Amino acid sequence: SETIDLQGGKAFGLLKAQQEGRLNEINKQFLDDPKYSSDEDLSRKLEAFKQKYMEFDLNGNGDIDIMSLKRMLEKLGVPKTHLELKKLIKEVSSGSGETFSYSIFLKMMLGKRSAILKMILMYEEKAREQEKPTGPPAKKAISELP
């Protein structure tokens, strides 16, 4: 009969390490590409994009599908309908299917058409900046109440 793999976490770690290796190779191609050589901070941007991509490529197959994109946008506080997501992926992948690869993701982030994903990452940065205040809440006057 079948054996049960009790090392799920270890296997997942290996999968993520392999994935990171593949993404690093793609990053190297972009760093060597003369088209992007004028972009300052390119290596820092590529590292940030790699981390984001790995976070949402949950199955580790190298592509972000519609459900991963949906999760990404919901986490960022900009949930989209299934139809909007399909349109977004179609625009990004040039109509080639319901997923997009890391290299397409990078071209989109570094190119002119990157408005949507840049906006997504910008929202996430803003969310980090607006940390919740600690301590007891400030007292309000009656006139300030809704």
Swiss-Prot record:
Residues 44-79, 81-115 form the EF-hand domain. InterPro entries: AIF-1_EF_pair, AIF1/AIF1L, EF-hand-dom_pair, EF_hand_dom. The modification N-acetylserine is found at S1. One of its GO terms (molecular function) is calcium ion binding. Homodimer (Potential). Monomer. Interacts with LCP1. SUPFAM superfamilies: EF-hand. It holds the Pfam family AIF-1. Keywords: Acetylation, Actin-binding, Calcium, Cell membrane, Cell projection, Cytoplasm, Cytoskeleton, Membrane, Metal-binding, Phosphoprotein, Repeat. Residues 127-146 are annotated as: Disordered. Gene3D superfamilies: EF-hand (1.10.238.10). The gene is AIF1. The keyword rRNA processing does not apply. One of its GO terms (cellular component) is lamellipodium. Ca(2+) 1 binds at D57, N59, N61, D63. This is Allograft inflammatory factor 1. Microglial cells in the central nervous system and dendritic cells and macrophages in several organs. Actin-binding protein that enhances membrane ruffling and RAC activation. Enhances the actin-bundling activity of LCP1. Binds calcium. Plays a role in RAC signaling and in phagocytosis. May play a role in macrophage activation and function. Promotes the proliferation of vascular smooth muscle cells and of T-lymphocytes. Enhances lymphocyte migration. Plays a role in vascular inflammation. Has a dual influence on glucose-induced insulin secretion: inhibition at low concentration and stimulation at high concentrations. GO terms for biological process: actin filament bundle assembly; actin filament polymerization; cellular response to type II interferon; inflammatory response; phagocytosis, engulfment; positive regulation of G1/S transition of mitotic cell cycle; positive regulation of monocyte chemotaxis; positive regulation of smooth muscle cell chemotaxis. Ca(2+) 2 binds at T99. It is a peripheral membrane protein. Its main location: cytoplasm. Transmembrane segments: none annotated.
